[in-house]
Amino acid sequence: MRVLVIFIPKSFPNKCLHFKKLGLWIIFQASIKEKSNHQKEILTEQQQQQIINNHINNSISSENLVIPLNNYEESPTQSNISSCYSSQSNLSSYSSTGSLSSYYGSNYYHGASSSSISSINSNIANSNSSSTGRDSTPTPTPTPIQTPSSTPSKKKRSWRIRTPSPKPKLESNNNHHHNHHNYYNNFSEISIELPPTPTYPQKPSFLSNSNQIPRPKSRHSHTNSADSYTSSYSSTYPSSTRSSQKQPPYYQQPINNKNNNNNNNINNFNFNGNNNNNNNNNNNNNNNNNNNNNNNNNNNNNNSNNMKISTSPNKLSNSNHSTNSNFSQCSSSHSLLDTNIGGINVNTQNLVSFTNETSNSGSTIIKPVALKSSSRSVFNSSNNQQYLFSSSTLSSSSSTKTNNNSTTTTTTTTAKTSSTSTNDYSSIKGKSLIDDDASCSISSFNAIEQQVLIPTVLSSSSSSHVMKRSNGSSNGGNSTIQSPSCNQISINKNNLVDIDDEDEDDEDDINGHWEKITIPSNMCRDQISIKNNFDESTKVIC
């Protein structure tokens, strides 16, 4: 520790004032008057010896010791040092310019040889107990002089708390390098037991893509569209086997017509749970038609026949409105709408494929009816009827299931007569769009706008045949054309859309604003073309 001793003249009342400031003890001490030089030297030696002893006890180097420069002679009338702190009024501090001398050293106190702070405190207690009052003029006490310390003391260094080394103690060994490696080897010897790695069974190869069923190899497997995969699946597995298996999902992707030649099944119209088997086997086709008729009677309330026209070609989308028509003995029908003025649109949207069937009585031809609509009305007459199919490229049969579930009827007529197209229907509301003589009827209800069906074409061929619209005669081919029966053509009035709603002029309706063409659920395998005589345009639809 450091002590600053200030010698004050004997006229000062506070003879033993001391305090600690910033870790430095400051002591005010009365001066001692030396009578002779010899006595002065003796006092000086005594002070030096006392300082050295204090230095040894407090572990302070002798370089920090400063010997007092001025030692006043002790007067005979020197007051006793025990007169410190005689009164509280004398403890006020004043500034003075008296003779002061700075002193650096350890615990130094006049008349005491103690080397600790406790000795100073004991002296203060003794001085307070034996203090005597002394009248003297109050003089200001001098301001203590503090000198900055440049070097820290060793005692402060000993106060620092040192954390123990994290390195564990090792057994004494002469080879220090060996001990260094032994320390790190101790950690490597720790064994950590991990749980066993779980083993899972190997995933089968056919379940690599869980969203698809294993794709069978067929002649249509080279196509890139998703609908061709659906058709190849249905054509590979028979209907009896396919009913117990998982059906492929419904795809809504465009169809590449050129890569789907002779694919005679519309799998996107799988509303009844069973599709027509397309193996060109007449017996299987007739059985599947009967199954479709049975399923229509049971599932017509649960299945939807409404589909919207999408902007992309040949893309089907389910409608939010379900068909509520009562199909007694009719198969499911699918509508075809014209979105362009002057004829049926040929932007690969209105292409239809049908099933090739022959009956016992001979080959027949299916003729769908082309309907015109304006202000929610249907106009159809013999002068404006249009035959969409060629007898030379298409043959099919219509099987109508009767009540006894055993007979199959076939109706054949000429091209100039038709049992379903000669009736003039003026309005949709309250009327049945099928002839009264037909074997079934559709319940009437109001038409809903913007609900349109468009079928997807899965087959086409290189042959094309242009049909004319003159009294129902075809451009090439003299064979008879069958008037479609009830199970072949049915009209879904919920899907009729009035394109020309604001125009009430009948003259504009003659321009051939074909709104809807209904087609049967059976499919053909040949290409179909139609011609609209209003604007002399020929468009291929199959």
From Swiss-Prot:
Bias type Polar residues, positions: 202-213
Region span, Disordered: 125-182, 194-333, 390-428, 459-487
Highest taxon above the source species: Eukaryota
Ranges of biased composition (kind: Low complexity): 125-138, 228-306, 314-333, 390-423, 459-479
Coiled coil regions, renumbered to chain: none
Name of protein: Uncharacterized protein DDB_G0275275
Species this protein is from: Dictyostelium discoideum
